[in-house]
A protein has these predicted regions:
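Secondary-structure boundary motif
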Residues: 174, 178, 201, 249-252, ...
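Mature extracytoplasmic enzyme cores
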Residues: 1-58, 63, 155, 172, ...
Length: 450
């Protein structure tokens, strides 16, 4: 313990920028640091460095109930902490996905959701080549090598994972405190291209947008969507913008010929943009999907627009439609749900009533998605609603005895689900949007995590 004074000095310096921001509520400043507990007690795995892995391989469990590493749809939100504080570890995770995307594992597995629907045994291969895996595997197998551990849904069919991957690669290249790393971008580029081409196969009606298939096939994996959806469609458009930005940088700075990909992605993007609003805009907000007729306001309908704006890409939707949608979400899913006391519910009718009083995901408050939504409100200039949402969730977690085991979901009947959840570290999105990515001392030390 001879070095403890030096350690204490470094910890104080690390915390000082956050503690000094008196324009942030005190409880938010507290929670920013406390939510990092999951990196230490969330089942993290960190291997030794080796050729191709300069800081080793790294992964955090989605949670102990869903014990597989770095679920990609979840880390879209939750990895914003890792990006800002330990960016080389964030790159390590994305390199692991880059290796996993081309791989295949034909092992057949029964898909759990079909049993819950009384439809018997339906099997699917564990991992199709070019499909973006949901996760990097589980501790009871060979993580990083055997991916797609979860089998509740057939993740080869998910319509958000490829977009999630592309957005995270461009985000980490663009916003890492270590500066732009072209070798990292080049390493991930082939997998990003494969992932988008694979996802485009699900554009069944050739409108440029991948179609959801009716079984839950996105992060809300108990919530069926049909046809083009606001959630997956907006992510797709944002991912195409990110892929174009990648292609241009790689060609300009490294001389990589990406003309074919630029032409292809530009065509898809033009068609997607032409049809997204036409199919989904109802005059006030974006319909959950184009074909199910489900009359709910989905809280995270414009996650893709949030990410595009966060990364300085062209927005997915016009400012006035973003603000109109966010106002509908605020009235229906926040103020209309328990008076805003719990946070934002995932999906309610426009009058704040549940479509199905026995529903699961629509009636839950997802902590990490709430933090992401709060950051979106902040980006769009509504700091009051951003603070209100964040405060409601922090109060539920820390006032309800759930601190240091933050759940994925909280309900109005005082139940909760999936503690030690990775997505909740999305609270660091609020730091990014409020401070314009103010640097935390120590995060800029390239390669120092190893």
């Amino acid at each position: 313990m001879r070095d403890w004074p030096d350690w204490r000095e470094q910890i104080d310096a690390w915390q000082a920028p956050v503690l000094a921001r008196e324009d942030l509520p005190e409880r938010l400043r507290m929670a920013l640091f406390n939510e990092l507990y999951d990196l230490a007690s969330g089942g993290s795995l960190w291997t030794a460095a080796r050729p191709g892995d300069p800081v080793g391989r790294f992964g955090v469990l989605e949670c102990f109930d869903y014990a597989w590493y770095e679920s990609l749809d979840v880390r879209l939100y939750g990895s914003l902490a890792l990006l800002q504080l330990w960016p080389e570890l964030d790159k390590a995770v994305l390199r692991s996905f880059a290796r996993a995307i081309p791989a295949a594992d034909a092992t057949p597995r029964p898909i759990g959701w079909y049993f819950t629907q009384g439809r018997g045994r339906v099997e699917a291969p564990r991992k199709r080549a070019a499909a973006t895996p949901h996760d990097l595997g589980a501790p009871n197998e060979s993580p990083f090598d055997a991916t797609n551990y979860t089998a509740y849904q057939d993740c080869n069919l998910w319509k958000d994972l490829a977009s999630d991957y592309v957005l995270q690669v461009w985000r980490t290249f663009l916003l890492s405190p270590n500066g732009e790393d072209l070798s990292f971008l080049a390493e991930c580029w082939p997998a990003a291209v494969q992932a988008l081409i694979y996802l485009k196969r699900f554009d069944v009606n050739h409108d440029g947008l991948p179609d959801n298939g009716g079984a839950p096939d996105q992060t809300f994996d108990d919530w069926p969507l049909q046809g083009v959806s606001a959630y997956c469609g907006a992510l797709w458009i944002a991912a195409l913008e990110a892929a174009l930005a990648m292609a241009q940088r790689l060609q300009l700075d490294l001389g990589l010929n990406t003309a074919e990909e630029q032409h292809q992605f530009s065509g898809w993007l033009e068609q997607s943009r032409a049809n997204f609003d036409r199919l989904l805009w109802n005059g006030e907000y974006y319909k959950i999907d184009a074909e199910s007729g489900t009359p709910v306001v989905m809280a995270d309908q414009l996650c893709g627009d949030f990410y595009a704006r966060l990364l300085g890409l062209p927005s997915v939707v016009a400012d006035e439609r973003s603000r109109s949608s966010l106002n509908a979400v605020k009235e229906a899913c926040f103020e209309g749900f328990e008076g805003g006391r719990l946070g934002v519910a995932n999906g309610l009718c426009r009058d704040g009533m549940p479509l199905d009083p026995k529903g699961t995901h629509p009636l839950e408050v997802w902590t990490g998605i709430n933090f992401g939504l709060a950051a979106y409100y902040r980006l769009m200039g509504d700091a009051t609603t951003a603070t209100a949402i964040c405060s409601a969730v922090v109060n539920q977690v820390y006032g309800g005895g759930l601190q240091f085991r933050t759940p994925e979901a909280i309900t109005a009947v005082k139940t909760y689900r999936a503690c030690h959840y990775l997505r909740a570290m999305a609270i660091w999105a609020l730091w990014a949007t409020h401070t314009d990515w103010q640097l935390i001392p120590g995060a800029e030390r390239a390669g120092s995590e190893g």
